[in-house]
Swiss-Prot record:
<keyword id="KW-0539">Nucleus</keyword>
<dbReference type="Pfam" id="PF03165">
    <property type="entry name" value="MH1"/>
</dbReference>
<dbReference type="GO" id="GO:0071144">
    <property type="term" value="C:heteromeric SMAD protein complex"/>
</dbReference>
<dbReference type="GO" id="GO:0160094">
    <property type="term" value="P:nematode pharynx development"/>
</dbReference>
<dbReference type="Pfam" id="PF03166">
    <property type="entry name" value="MH2"/>
</dbReference>
<comment type="function">
    <text>Involved in TGF-beta pathway. Plays a role in male tail tip morphogenesis.</text>
</comment>
<dbReference type="GO" id="GO:0070411">
    <property type="term" value="F:I-SMAD binding"/>
</dbReference>
<dbReference type="GO" id="GO:0005737">
    <property type="term" value="C:cytoplasm"/>
</dbReference>
<dbReference type="InterPro" id="IPR013790">
    <property type="entry name" value="Dwarfin"/>
</dbReference>
<dbReference type="GO" id="GO:0110039">
    <property type="term" value="P:positive regulation of nematode male tail tip morphogenesis"/>
</dbReference>
<dbReference type="InterPro" id="IPR008984">
    <property type="entry name" value="SMAD_FHA_dom_sf"/>
</dbReference>
<keyword id="KW-0963">Cytoplasm</keyword>
<dbReference type="GO" id="GO:0042661">
    <property type="term" value="P:regulation of mesodermal cell fate specification"/>
</dbReference>
<dbReference type="GO" id="GO:0045138">
    <property type="term" value="P:nematode male tail tip morphogenesis"/>
</dbReference>
<keyword id="KW-0479">Metal-binding</keyword>
<dbReference type="GO" id="GO:0009791">
    <property type="term" value="P:post-embryonic development"/>
</dbReference>
<dbReference type="GO" id="GO:0030307">
    <property type="term" value="P:positive regulation of cell growth"/>
</dbReference>
Length: 418
């Protein structure tokens, strides 16, 4: 018996939509599909339900609909190829064109076959890399909230039980001269002042990547935040210790560790676009760092959206590493997961220095205010946005450094002409 509700309700679990996508586009696409299958191919409806339930774990049959005159299907005034539409609805929300899809060998009615029926089974296609295609800006449909704070006494008990040691208490952020008129060209490779050479008490014989991260990193500062206008860093880098910090556009001079007011940062070379953008930052963003597991959440407090590029977040959701996520007012999203980083580090450490070193890209997060960048914007890079920040996460960077220091050098030859 066909479970119509099961096929429809799967959209309720779809977390993402593309930035220019109508809120009900996926639902309309599924309603359209239901009508076509009921009219032309009821058996295919059962095949679709089975395919969605198995999620590619078992072999499934083709799910076909009639090919239109131009091969495309119209949903909400937008035309696209049907297999692209339903692969996007059910599997890859960041999918943009048929150039990113390739049919599996068992698919008898794939789009490329040119037959009168087209298979739209999303598990009969696999994703391929398409050169020259910028990933779309994606918008979460639902918020991810940070976990509730554990009472201090319970947290202490749990930590002693887990690692035999206690995490240090938060301390106030070090004094920073916010108004220092110092400008630096953007350096994509990182932090200037962070020391990752500390010695850690790790039991002999235990691979560093398998040690709980609280044993590897016990410093009071969990991140360093840099503020940029276009490709120029403005002011000093700010080390962060408070587990909850607000970065806003106001001018609060209080340095209490829980707020960074970008309105205090001065730049004599600021243009009108930057000035106007700064006026709209407002309440900005609230960052919540969960010390117990190393995860980081961002909640947009501004009336204008914030735009986030986190390769860790993108990996979790199966997106291209350079994908930009748009977070609207009052929406919250996990932008870093330490457990995922640990799993990747464990895997990469077995594959050598180069694979492990590449994970340093996951230790920093870029975030712009008000103005976005990417496929749907005239700005193709974060350094073209008026106001943005870069967040360097200390714990994963120190953990990675510890692993790299136990490895030999890269096998790639290097010379003056390499």
């Amino acid at each position: 018996m066909i479970n119509f509700d099961g096929i429809k309700k799967i959209t309720e679990r779809l977390k993402w939509k593309q930035g220019d996508e109508d809120e009900n586009w996926a639902k309309k696409a599924i309603d359209n599909l239901m009508k076509k299958l009921i009219k032309h191919n009821k058996q295919a409806l059962e095949n679709l339900e089975f395919a969605l339930r198995c999620q590619g774990q078992q072999k499934t049959e083709c799910v076909t609909i009639p090919r239109s005159l131009d091969g495309r299907l119209q949903i909400s005034h937008r035309k696209a190829l049907p297999h692209v539409i339903y692969c996007r609805v059910y599997r890859w929300p960041d999918l943009q064109s048929h150039h990113e899809l390739k049919a599996i060998e068992d698919c008898r009615f794939c789009y490329e076959s040119g037959q009168k029926d087209i298979c739209i089974n999303p598990y009969h296609y696999k994703r391929v890399h398409a050169t020259g295609v910028l990933p779309p800006v994606l918008v979460p449909r639902y918020s991810e909230k940070p976990p509730q704070e554990v009472p201090p006494t319970l947290a202490k008990f749990q930590l002693m039980e887990m690692s035999g040691s206690r995490m240090p208490q938060n301390v106030n952020m070090a004094n920073v001269n916010f108004t220092a008129n110092q400008f630096h060209q953007y350096n994509p490779n990182g932090i200037e002042e962070m020391d990752t050479s500390q010695k850690f008490d790790i039991p002999p014989g235990v691979p560093t990547c398998l040690v709980p991260f609280d044993k590897v990193w016990e410093e009071q500062f969990w991140a360093t935040v840099s503020y940029y206008e276009l490709n120029t860093r403005v002011g000093e880098q700010v080390k962060v210790s408070s587990t909850t910090i607000t970065i806003d556009g106001f001018t609060d001079p209080c340095i209490n560790g829980s707020k960074i007011s970008l309105g205090l940062f001065s730049n004599v070379n600021r243009n009108a676009t930057i000035e106007n953008t700064r006026r709209h930052i407002g309440n900005g963003v609230k960052l919540t760092y969960v010390r117990s597991n190393g995860s980081l959440f961002a909640q947009c407090e501004s009336d204008s959206a914030i735009f986030v590029q986190s390769s860790n977040c993108n990996y979790i959701n199966g997106f291209h590493s350079t994908t930009v996520v748009k977070i609207a007012n009052k929406c919250s999203l996990k932008i870093f997961d330490m457990e995922i980083f640990r799993q990747l580090l464990e895997d990469c450490s077995r594959r050598g220095f180069d694979a492990s070193f590449d994970l340093q890209k996951m230790t920093f997060i870029r975030m712009s205010f008000v103005k976005g960048w990417g496929a749907e914007y005239q700005r193709q890079d974060v350094t073209s946005t008026p106001c943005w920040i870069e967040i360097h996460l200390h714990a994963p960077l120190a953990w990675l450094d510890r692993v790299l220091s136990t490895m030999g050098p890269t096998p790639r030859p290097i010379s003056s002409i390499s």
